[in-house]
From Swiss-Prot:
Belongs to the amino acid/polyamine transporter 2 family. Mtr/TnaB/TyrP permease subfamily. PROSITE patterns: AROMATIC_AA_PERMEASE_1. It is found in: Cell inner membrane. It is a multi-pass membrane protein. InterPro entries: Amino_acid_transport_2 (IPR018227), Trp/try_permease_CS (IPR013061), Trp_tyr_transpt (IPR013059). GO terms for molecular function: aromatic amino acid transmembrane transporter activity; symporter activity; transmembrane transporter activity. Gene3D superfamilies: Amino acid/polyamine transporter I. It holds the Pfam family Trp_Tyr_perm. GO terms for cellular component: plasma membrane. This is Tryptophan-specific transport protein.
Length: 418
């Protein structure tokens, strides 16, 4: 009998990194503008460690169940129906709010690109934000409506383009980083940047979301917990490095005070690119940066809405016929599209709310799963490092994120406006 070769660590790591890295990273420089570069690195490393650990806690619980068992199955068995309902609602909320966030920013960039493409020295074309959002949403929603295969093929093309555009834009930006901008002195009106650290956490959290992929990796590696663990560390580590490079590229070129118009527009990505454009001397870098942002938002939009589409189809029992897929498409896309037309500047705010809901299923629930699984299966072959202390540490991280998001909305904490 020919022994089947075990999948490489790189394959699993790419699944994790590919899931985590997306349009969420575009919000990080704006959400961390208050705490600035050093503080943003601390926030990202802290978030990376806690989110990686919580992912490993899902792995620990998952290994006690048959291959292919879903996240929902494990939560229902270990924590009961109530927690499973809360978990399911938080997942749906995150998917809807991210869809809204991507339509708002994707619409803004579509608007800018079309205006540039169809304007000339003699006449200027002014396509509105509403039209940009409608065009962006309708074209990409058509791929989701068609089939998963259509999404798969189009996403592959977008990812290749995104990687090329990312390296073209960031290498150029990194070469022009100014240390005076990156390590700027504290403004006279502020004694320290630390008060802004807490409110940056919920947006950073969204940048490390991969937890729904853990059951798939358990199946992929044939229940080899150590290999799954290593692939998670490599994948999230790669995401962390890319995020730090992105912070360096943006916050090393765009002065802290210049984030004011970006923050005023809710962290809108097109506003960030417009502000950054003033400090880019080479024209091709602006073009590459625009394409990178557009493709990052498009790939994230397709990935998130495909998951939401399947969730809606299962929830309402819509079949896979033409009529069934049309119903699912309307329920999936219409609410966030209408919201984006009503509130067109809410990208970072929406990402923050997504972080608030994601805290439940990506931090608190995994920690509770680890605790419950150790009580139910005391002889486990794989346990996450840190014992009960680490369970408490991850739950505290989740609570801090919830307090940060709610506190920021209620004005409890300092808010940076540029």
């Amino acid at each position: 009998m020919i022994q089947q070769k075990s999948p490489s660590l790189l394959g699993g790591a790419m699944i994790i990194a590919g899931t985590a890295i997306g349009a969420g990273m575009l919000a990080n420089p704006t959400s961390t503008a208050g705490v600035w570069f050093i503080g943003s690195i601390l926030a990202l490393i802290y978030t990376w460690f806690c989110m990686t650990t919580s992912g490993l806690m899902i792995l620990e619980a998952n290994l006690h169940y048959p291959t292919g068992s879903s996240f929902d199955t494990i939560v229902k068995d270990l924590l009961g129906k109530s927690w499973n309902t809360i978990n399911g609602l938080s997942v749906a909320f995150v998917l809807y709010i991210l869809t809204y966030a991507y339509i708002t920013s994707g619409g803004g960039i579509t608007q800018n690109l079309l205006n540039q493409a169809f304007s000339s020295a003699e006449s200027a074309v002014d396509i509105g934000r509403t039209s940009g959002s409608l065009i962006f949403c309708l074209i990409l929603a058509a791929f989701v409506w068609l089939s998963t295969k259509a999404v798969d093929r189009f996403t592959t093309v977008l990812i290749v383009g995104m990687v090329v555009a990312f390296f073209l834009s960031t290498t150029g930006l990194l070469s022009s980083v100014k240390t005076a901008v990156l390590f700027n002195t504290v403004a006279e009106s502020e004694q320290t940047y630390l008060p802004y650290l807490l409110t940056a956490l919920p947006v950073c959290l969204v940048s490390f979301g991969f937890h729904g992929n853990v059951p798939s990796l358990v199946k992929y590696y044939d229940r080899d917990g150590r290999r799954v663990m290593k692939s998670i560390f490599i994948g999230t580590g790669l995401a962390l490095v890319i995020y730090i490079l992105w912070q360096l590229a943006v916050q090393g070129n765009l002065p802290r005070t210049e984030f004011a118009p970006v923050i005023e527009k809710g962290g809108d990505v097109s506003a960030l690119l417009e502000a950054l454009h003033k400090y880019i001397e080479v024209e091709y870098l602006s073009v590459a940066l625009n394409f990178f942002a557009y493709m990052a938002i498009s790939t994230s939009f397709l990935g998130v809405t495909l998951g939401l589409f399947d969730y809606i189809a299962d929830l309402f029992k819509f079949d896979d016929s033409l009529l069934g897929r049309t119903k699912t498409t309307l329920v999936t896309f219409l609410p966030p599209l209408l919201l984006s037309l009503q509130f067109p500047y809410g990208f970072v705010i929406a990402i923050g709310y997504a972080g608030l809901a994601a805290t439940i299923w990506a931090a608190i629930v995994p920690a509770l799963l680890a605790k419950a699984s150790r009580q139910k299966f005391p002889q486990a072959s794989y346990k996450v490092y840190g014992g009960n202390f680490m369970i408490g540490f991850v739950i505290l991280f989740g609570i801090l994120n919830i307090v940060a998001q709610i506190g920021a909305n209620l004005g409890w904490f300092a808010s940076f406006t540029g």
